């Protein structure tokens, strides 16, 4: 499979983080940043925590892609009590 461009800022590469989505030019997992966003962490604080290796535009792209993925998989979701 090699590498794949998912967006302007997000890629997958089997040689980086076992092929998990990361921000281009980093080893920062998109999932880690999305968890920070979900925990209501300010985007500026997220950027600072990652020492400026990601930008607001990169975080925005991750959120938009996650939203599209969720919407496209809604029929597959099972909500439990």
Task: Name what the model sees in each region.
Residues 4-45:
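A short, structured beta-strand/loop element
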Residues 29-81:
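Long, charge-rich, low-complexity alpha-helical segments
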